From Swiss-Prot:
InterPro entries listed in its UniProt record: DEP_dom, PH-like_dom_sf, PH_domain, Pleckstrin, PLEK_DEP, WH-like_DNA-bd_sf, WH_DNA-bd_sf
GO MF annotation terms: phosphatidylinositol-3,4-bisphosphate binding; protein homodimerization activity; protein kinase C binding
The species this protein was found in: Homo sapiens (Human)
Lineage of producing organism: Eukaryota, Metazoa, Chordata, Craniata, Vertebrata
Residue numbers carrying Phosphoserine: 113, 117
Domain of life: Eukaryota
Residue ranges of domain PH in the record: 4-101, 244-347
Gene3D superfamilies: Pleckstrin-homology domain (PH domain)/Phosphotyrosine-binding domain (PTB), Winged helix-like DNA-binding domain superfamily/Winged helix DNA-binding domain
Protein's UniProt name: Pleckstrin
Any one of the GO CC terms: plasma membrane
Pfam families given in the database record: DEP (PF00610), PH (PF00169)
Domain DEP: 136-221
Function: Major protein kinase C substrate of platelets.
Swiss-Prot/TrEMBL GO biological process terms: actin cytoskeleton organization; cell projection organization; cortical actin cytoskeleton organization; hematopoietic progenitor cell differentiation; integrin-mediated signaling pathway; intracellular signal transduction; negative regulation of calcium-mediated signaling; negative regulation of G protein-coupled receptor signaling pathway
The keyword Repeat appears for this protein: yes
Amino acid sequence: MEPKRIREGYLVKKGSVFNTWKPMWVVLLEDGIEFYKKKSDNSPKGMIPLKGSTLTSPCQDFGKRMFVFKITTTKQQDHFFQAAFLEERDAWVRDIKKAIKCIEGGQKFARKSTRRSIRLPETIDLGALYLSMKDTEKGIKELNLEKDKKIFNHCFTGNCVIDWLVSNQSVRNRQEGLMIASSLLNEGYLQPAGDMSKSAVDGTAENPFLDNPDAFYYFPDSGFFCEENSSDDDVILKEEFRGVIIKQGCLLKQGHRRKNWKVRKFILREDPAYLHYYDPAGAEDPLGAIHLRGCVVTSVESNSNGRKSEEENLFEIITADEVHYFLQAATPKERTEWIRAIQMASRTGK
């Protein structure tokens, strides 16, 4: 019997021979991970057995490269994968860990447990806590804060984080809150903004997280930026980058000249509405930007000849300037989600 497919999608993988990062179509099975050069390929480029393997996340071996996790096999071979964003990494890590645990216990992988899970008081689910903190109504309020002639947008103070943890009854006291906030920082759920919080993370303070009104932090993917006399680390972002990120992930994009298809990481922002696309293997600057205000986005079932397209899950964006972009999602559900999100963003802001 074929092993069950648990999860699949695009991840960026580090080459085992050369120090190159390339997007791959990755499939998590009950007993291993297969990776393909393209989603349409029939045979995988490689397979990683999960029995006896260990998983490290977050993996911080590569400096500025975020959302990386590492799988080490029983033969001490390291395999590095990079997700497009934090929640995507966490979803892969959660399923891989569960698959490894199921192999060890001789069990079949199942998403829903038939037994009621008993949550111990001292056990904190950082992923769930992060989502609660980001809740627009009940979560931590993102502010524009000023310090040292700089304006930090979409951020909050260290003491606000501890205040929220205590008032939300996630922790019993501020000392326990400091421990949880440090864990959130170490796992990448919070990012330091400004010299004070960055110095604490770099080890010049006793605790990596500071319960302090002058220590600033932000959520990854929040649209954080710093204005005015900014340092090299706090880049002044253009107007088009100021919108809040509402969706991101990898899609196939057709080139305008050669008409070939390549995997690109897309980040969708609203107000102003822009869809930026990047080389998923690591470039920080976008390859291009699609201004979505007044655009039309539709699913594509047939090509210009009227015949049914051989490519599945296609959709097209036509900008107000009548530039056409053809994109391909991995599944019908993913295509629908992208179309709805782009349509919603195109009606907001500038």
